[in-house]
UniProtKB/Swiss-Prot annotation:
Main location: plastid
Species of origin: Oryza sativa subsp. indica
UniProt-listed SUPFAM superfamilies: Ribosomal protein L36
InterPro entries: Ribosomal_bL36, Ribosomal_bL36_sp
Bridged cysteine pairs (disulfide): none
GO MF terms held by the record: structural constituent of ribosome
HAMAP family documented for this protein: Ribosomal_bL36
Lineage top rank: taxon: Eukaryota
Protein name: Large ribosomal subunit protein bL36c
Family of this protein: Belongs to the bacterial ribosomal protein bL36 family.
Keyword line: Chloroplast, Plastid, Ribonucleoprotein, Ribosomal protein
GO cellular component, one term: ribonucleoprotein complex
Amino acid sequence: MKIRASVRKICTKCRLIRRRGRIRVICSNPKHKQRQG
């Protein structure tokens, strides 16, 4: 999980999801997991 100021999709399988007021990226590739901090 990378915590970044700006999250974006890295590949086509990345999905932007809003959970508990935070924007997250979930993907089949674990390296692409991100959260907005």
